[in-house]
Amino acid sequence: MNTLGLGLVKRLLSPIPLIVLAGVLALVALLGYGLASNKTKESSTSTLLNKVAPTPELPKLDGGGKSSLAAYKGKVVLLNYWASWCEPCRQEAPLLQRWQPTLEKAGGTVLGIDVLDVEGDARAFVRKYGLTYPILRDGNGDSQTAYGILAYPETFVIGRNGRVAAAVRGEVTDKFMRQSVLPLLEKSS
């Protein structure tokens, strides 16, 4: 083997390229885990389950003053945290809008909370998906802290009693709506 080939082999087997390769492989593994764990997960371990839901007052996205979860006392509320740049949020928006009339007829509502987003982008998102349910804006992330939000979307089902009845991390599905929301609507509608 010539000295050029031997030098290349020595450089490839030196610790630095091996460390870089190990780092890249670890990053790929973490990314894969993150994508796999971004699937919808009902959160039976949420620290808020069966507790009274926090009710921070936030500005309405449409500019019509402020509101909070307290304004929906006695209703079943699907409290959905989202952002316009969140791909899973884009995927679930049509489903949430499709369920809104059913919720309204039975004394409930979807209540969207746009978090850490550019206001113009959030408004464009609402227009694009034709969202008609109320949306509040958490520009600095305070309310997401109260709910322990880890990623978007994250959704909480608030019963008529103001307590968190269910939670889901990731996209809401029709199955989740049927199993976790409809029974609450039927209880005393």
What is each model feature region?
Residues 1-59, 189:
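N-terminal targeting signals for export/organelle localization
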Residues 55-77:
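A short beta-strand-turn-helix
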Residues 69, 120-123:
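Acidic helix N-cap motif at the loop->helix transition within catalytic regions
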Residues 75-77, 82-85, 151:
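Short pre-active-site segment immediately N-terminal to redox-active cysteine/selenocysteine motifs
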Residues 81-98:
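Conserved redox-active cysteine motifs that mediate thiol-disulfide chemistry
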Residues 124-132, 137-188:
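Thiol/disulfide oxidoreductase modules built on the thioredoxin-like
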